[in-house]
C-alpha cells in the first residue's frame, strides 16, 4: 500500500518565507530588478542577483550586457544591492570578431580612488592582423589608460564609465595611434575586494 505524503511541515516552511523586492544601486537609478524569497532577512545578505543592463536602464539595445549585483542590506521588504561585476554575452562577442584581424585580450586589475579593486577584461579588435610587438604595445596602452582613468574616479563613477562605454571610447582613442583599431569593448569586470592602502 502506498504511503501518504507528509506535506504539512513543508507547507509551514513555505508560508514562513517572505518576498523581498530587490533594487540596484543609486548609480543605476535604484531600479527594481526582481524579487527574492527568504524566511530570514539575514539570509538575503550576500545573495547574487543578475539582470541585463537593458532591464536595468529600460534600453533593450543593451540586453547583451549581464550585470551582477550582491545584496548588502535589507530594510522592510526591500533588499538593496551593490555592483559586483558585468559580462558581455558570448554571442555578442562572437559577432564582433572578423576574419583576418587580431583580437587582443587584456585582463588588468584597477584600483579606484576610494580603494576598490576591480579586475577588468578588455577586448580590442584590429582592422588587420597585428604582429606580436604591436599586440604588446596595444596591451600596454590599454593597461595605462585603464589605470589612469581608475585612479581619478570613485568606484561608482568607474562602474558607470565601464558599463556605458565611455571608458572603452577613451581606450580606443589611446590605442588607435599605435595600430588601426576597429573596436574596443570592456567585456567583463569583477569586484575583487577593497584594495590595501
UniProtKB/Swiss-Prot annotation:
GO terms for biological process: translation. Belongs to the eukaryotic ribosomal protein eS1 family. Keywords: Ribonucleoprotein, Ribosomal protein. Transmembrane segments: none annotated. The lineage of its organism: Archaea, Methanobacteriati, Methanobacteriota, Stenosarchaea group, Methanomicrobia. This is Small ribosomal subunit protein eS1. Disulfide bonds: none annotated. HAMAP family: Ribosomal_eS1. One of its GO terms (cellular component) is ribonucleoprotein complex. It comes from Methanoculleus marisnigri (strain ATCC 35101 / DSM 1498 / JR1). InterPro entries: Ribosomal_eS1 (IPR001593), Ribosomal_eS1_arc (IPR030838). GO terms for molecular function: structural constituent of ribosome. It comes from the Archaea.
